[in-house]
């Protein structure tokens, strides 16, 4: 079946997890570290095809600054076992930065408490309610991928055959998602897919902030998150 932003998901998880590690190794705030990397103009890097577009560092900074503001990033200390993680990504011509707040019990039970998403998808949003719904759906899909979705192969065949063993997020598991948009003077861009890639790395970065455990592979159902 269809999968939102399949290439960007893996790219974002690898790059945003590694950038988070660099920030902690440097003793820097992870969100400010990203802003510092984007402080200088970046040479346009585009390619061929309908999704190709130059990368705009100012727009990336804009969504990071907005998500810092709305999430209250760094404004108050969090108890051990609770953390906030951040990630951003550019895909389908859209820019999204997201903060995840999560808690992990000492025996490893994970609870995603809230997600804040800030997106720059151009100058005009025709249907704001539907745009917000698209982002909320992307975030829930991203959480499902991070928490328990995995494709395995046995003797040349996929083991998973339905949503019974490739689980989607259920209503009871749905997480509050707060959506904000940053307008820029460019034509409208992608929306349904670019909000998903930052979710898994932001969640794993939150887990590190909460427990000190660094997750470098998905899904999280394969990992022991217990801590002492």
How would you name each of these model-derived features?
Residues 1-228:
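Cofactor-binding beta-sheet edge motifs in enzyme active sites
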């Amino acid at each position: 079946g269809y999968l939102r932003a399949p290439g960007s998901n893996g790219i974002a998880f690898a790059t945003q997890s590694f950038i988070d590690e660099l920030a902690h190794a440097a003793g820097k705030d992870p969100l400010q570290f990203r802003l510092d990397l984007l402080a200088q103009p970046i040479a346009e890097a585009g390619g061929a095809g309908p999704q190709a577009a130059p990368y705009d560092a100012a727009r990336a900074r804009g969504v990071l600054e907005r998500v810092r503001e709305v999430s209250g990033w760094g404004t108050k200390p969090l108890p051990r076992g609770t953390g906030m993680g951040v990630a951003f990504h550019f895909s389908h011509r859209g820019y999204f930065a997201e903060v995840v707040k999560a808690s992990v019990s000492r025996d490893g039970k994970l609870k995603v408490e809230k997600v804040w998403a800030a997106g720059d998808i151009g100058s005009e949003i025709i249907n704001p309610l539907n745009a917000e719904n698209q982002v909320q759906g992307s975030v829930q899909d991203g959480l499902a991928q991070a928490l328990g979705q995995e494709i395995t192969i046995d003797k040349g065949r996929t083991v998973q055959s339905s949503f019974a063993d490739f689980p989607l997020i259920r209503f009871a598991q749905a997480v509050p998602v707060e959506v904000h948009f940053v307008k820029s003077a460019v034509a409208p861009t992608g929306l349904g897919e670019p909000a998903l890639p930052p979710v898994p790395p932001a969640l794993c970065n939150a887990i590190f902030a909460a427990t000190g455990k660094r997750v470098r592979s998905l899904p999280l159902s394969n990992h022991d998150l217990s801590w002492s």
